[in-house]
Curated annotation (Swiss-Prot):
Signal peptide: none annotated. Belongs to the bacterial ribosomal protein bL19 family. It comes from Picosynechococcus sp. (strain ATCC 27264 / PCC 7002 / PR-6) (Agmenellum quadruplicatum). This is Large ribosomal subunit protein bL19. InterPro entries: Ribosomal_bL19, Ribosomal_bL19_CS, Ribosomal_bL19_sf, Translation_prot_SH3-like_sf. GO terms for cellular component: cytosolic large ribosomal subunit. GO terms for molecular function: structural constituent of ribosome.
């Protein structure tokens, strides 16, 4: 067994198997574990998936939302223990793999059409 196979077998144990199918353009709500002192709580972060990066245990999604008129982006490691849950709110109909052009848009121009052919 070479080193790469050993690494893959260790990573396979850490992968989450309860993740929903997520696509670019979807609106998702990510529950993030926040530790404040001795207490731990789950903070929801809702926004549009503008990018996905595959790579086994290093799989990430970039979620963008507008907060008080300012665009906020956050990158989540999907298999991280800090990500408690992910729920797809609505499916988006897009024709690009990365939606970085939404960064330059303001207001109603940032809306994405809803997709009805994929179940939530």
């Amino acid at each position: 067994m070479n080193a790469e196979a050993i690494i893959r077998s260790i990573e396979a144990e850490q992968l989450k198997d309860d993740l929903p199918t997520i696509h670019v353009g979807d609106t998702v709500r990510v529950g993030v574990k926040i530790k404040e002192g001795t207490k731990e709580r789950v903070q929801p972060y809702e926004g549009t998936v503008i990018a996905m990066r595959n790579g086994g245990i290093n799989e990430t999604i970039t979620v963008r939302k507008i907060f008080q008129g300012i665009g906020v982006e956050r990158v989540f490691l999907l298999h991280s223990p800090l990500v408690d849950n992910i729920k797809v709110i609505r499916r988006g109909k897009v024709r690009r793999a990365k939606l970085y052009y939404l960064r330059d848009r303001v207001g109603k121009a940032t809306r994405i059409k809803q997709r009805f052919d994929r179940p939530i």
